[in-house]
């Protein structure tokens, strides 16, 4: 039995190393929709990878709080540190209250927050999306992607 497993492992190793796997694209312009903790985390992680990041929130209180803070602080495993918001002459997250401005130049758009907010965004996003933009739902554990796709299709995407 050990020989059969060794043969299997060797065969799998050869087959997986001989394939040309597609290169992961690097996106430079990212929009994050939502002002909660998930959105702030995603924005800081994207900034830590060198992306130009715009964080959209329709709620002025969220943006005011974010702008008056020292930034978004990440601790633990992975990138750590404080990532600035709306600061001049340093890489920082751009906070924005206009949806069209937030998504216009984005290559990737992260849609964060609970399902009912994702639904609202999906209903208005169709008018603002362009061909080639990537839309990512975070979190994606609730079949919200199906509902979002449905609303986008109804909206003309």
Give, region by region, the residue ranges found by the protein language model.
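A short, basic/flexible loop-to-alpha-helix module at the beginning of a structural domain
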Residues: 4-28
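Hydrophobic/small residue at the entry helix of a nucleotide-binding pocket
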Residues: 37-39
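Conserved N-terminal Rossmann-fold NAD(P) cofactor-binding segment
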Residues: 52-105
């Amino acid at each position: 039995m050990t020989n059969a497993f060794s043969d299997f492992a060797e065969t799998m190793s050869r087959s997986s190393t001989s394939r040309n796997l597609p290169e992961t694209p690097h996106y430079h312009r990212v929009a994050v929709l939502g002002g909660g903790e998930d959105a702030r985390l995603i924005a800081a992680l994207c900034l830590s990878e060198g992306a130009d990041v715009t964080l959209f929130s329709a709620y002025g209180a969220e943006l005011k709080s974010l702008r008056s803070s020292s930034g978004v602080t990440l601790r633990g495993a992975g990138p750590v540190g404080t990532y600035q918001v709306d600061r001049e002459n340093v890489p920082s997250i751009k906070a924005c209250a206009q949806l069209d401005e937030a998504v216009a130049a984005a290559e990737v758009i992260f849609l964060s927050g609970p399902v009912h907010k994702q639904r609202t965004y999906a209903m208005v996003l169709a008018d603002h999306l362009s061909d080639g933009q990537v839309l990512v739902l975070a979190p994606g554990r609730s079949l919200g992607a199906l509902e979002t796709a449905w609303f986008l299709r109804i909206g003309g995407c």
